[in-house]
Amino acid sequence: MLKQLKNYRRIVVKIGSALLVDRAAGLKRDWLESLGQDIAALHHAGVEVLVVSSGAIALGRTVLGLPKKALKLEESQAAAAAGQIALAKAYADVLGGHSIRSGQILVTLSDTEERRRYLNARATIETLLKLKAVPVINENDTVATTEIRYGDNDRLAARVATMMGADLLVLLSDIDGLYTAPPHKNPDAEFLPLVETITPQIEAMAGAAASELSRGGMKTKLDAGKIANAAGTAMIITSGTRFGPLSAIDRGERATLFEPARAPVNAWKTWISGNLEPAGRLTVDAGAAKALKSGKSLLPAGVKEIDGQFERGDTVAVLNEDGREIARGLIAYDAEDARKIAGHKSDEISEILGYDARAAMIHRNDLVVRAASNAEVA
């Protein structure tokens, strides 16, 4: 059973574009007012609330009168520029009506994937919370490109939740939770009120995005769940289409709870695990996969194949022979040297490379292993 939201310490709420913006009418002001009432109730109860809000591009399209057809990159960026101003003002007005201050944070992928910028972003948001302001966070779509972006705010919200040590992430969506199949396609789909671990079977239940205003679907929400749950953050998926969507959770309206890992990883490994776009991928043999699960470092001898271009210290994914990701870590070699030593014993590395080097390709202190259930283990 879901506990009352007021019993959480810090909550990240993600709001999708389709909830905020109507293609013809623009901003759904009445709905936003109802959300503001929910946030205010939690805020005045001592709960810290952070908002990750989509909607800048969708709102900017309306503001600028752009056509319904797919936008070019520069048109999307222009729409975001216009929409961000309108969106920030709307939140400031709504929350200000409850004597709550807000602050806008626009981030790019590198703000969470590069350690120094990650720490700076965290410090800024933490300061806003100490000042009793509600941070309103969105991807900076005015400068993000197709190649370098989060791509959806579900995973951004999960990254924010883990970065800020939130104990709950709420994804407000156009669907009221997870089903065994997309319910709009399969009338026999069964609703799942609780997910203890996100298994491959759970992932297979995900469908595609249902709205042209949204970039994310159930798959991205499950990706968000894996990031959040591994760091000890619970996640709820519920419908945001009703007025007062947060208080609706407390009233017992339908929602799916994803339980956090029982043994969450530490802050350093949370950052590694949450990296959204690994720079490369290493395929390892069965022996290496077994060694990683027992807490060992990844040695070159067990590496069968290397994909991608990366530098020393970049985050890479480790795959088993079936192509499934089993770990993620910071690699001790660049791609060129890694390819040279792959498959070789550690005592051969110096002779191959011509300099003294580390025995491990990824040290266990820089490695996060995914258990079969998708929970993270150190």
UniProtKB/Swiss-Prot annotation:
Reactions catalysed: L-glutamate + ATP = L-glutamyl 5-phosphate + ADP
Gene3D superfamilies: Acetylglutamate kinase-like, PUA domain
Keywords: Amino-acid biosynthesis, ATP-binding, Cytoplasm, Kinase, Nucleotide-binding, Proline biosynthesis, Transferase
Protein residues bound to substrate: S54, D141, N153
Major site of localization recorded for this protein: cytoplasm
Pathway given in the UniProt record: Amino-acid biosynthesis; L-proline biosynthesis; L-glutamate 5-semialdehyde from L-glutamate: step 1/2
MF annotations from Gene Ontology: ATP binding; glutamate 5-kinase activity; RNA binding
EC nos: 2.7.2.11
GO annotation terms (biological process): L-proline biosynthetic process
GO cellular component: cytosol
Cellular compartments annotated: Cytoplasm
Matching CDD domains: AAK_G5K_ProB, PUA_G5K
SUPFAM superfamilies, sorted: Carbamate kinase-like, PUA domain-like
Domain of life the protein comes from: Bacteria
Family matches, as InterPro entries: AceGlu_kinase-like_sf (IPR036393), Asp/Glu/Uridylate_kinase (IPR001048), G5K_ProB (IPR041739), Glu/AcGlu_kinase (IPR001057), Glu_5kinase (IPR011529), Glu_5kinase/COase_Synthase (IPR005715), Glutamate_5-kinase_CS (IPR019797), PUA (IPR002478)
Domain PUA residues, every copy: 279-356
Binding site for ATP: K14, S173, D174
Task of the protein: Catalyzes the transfer of a phosphate group to glutamate to form L-glutamate 5-phosphate.
Family indicated by similarity: Belongs to the glutamate 5-kinase family.
UniProt protein name: Glutamate 5-kinase
